[in-house]
């Protein structure tokens, strides 16, 4: 489960959820604005 590459993250997070994270990343209302 602990791979040396960061590509494993894509397989752990669903594409739809990842897209939401990208949207909220630019959302000033989100606490994780630094993400």
From Swiss-Prot:
Function summary: Defense against chitin-containing fungal pathogens.
GO biological process: chitin catabolic process; defense response; polysaccharide catabolic process
Family: Belongs to the glycosyl hydrolase 19 family. Chitinase class I subfamily.
EC number of the protein: 3.2.1.14
Keyword Hydrolase: yes
Annotated GO MF terms: endochitinase activity
Protein name: Basic endochitinase CH1
Superkingdom in the source lineage: Eukaryota
EC class name: hydrolase
Lineage: Eukaryota, Viridiplantae, Streptophyta, Embryophyta, Tracheophyta
Reactions catalysed: Random endo-hydrolysis of N-acetyl-beta-D-glucosaminide (1->4)-beta-linkages in chitin and chitodextrins
Keywords: Carbohydrate metabolism, Chitin degradation, Glycosidase, Hydrolase, Plant defense, Polysaccharide degradation
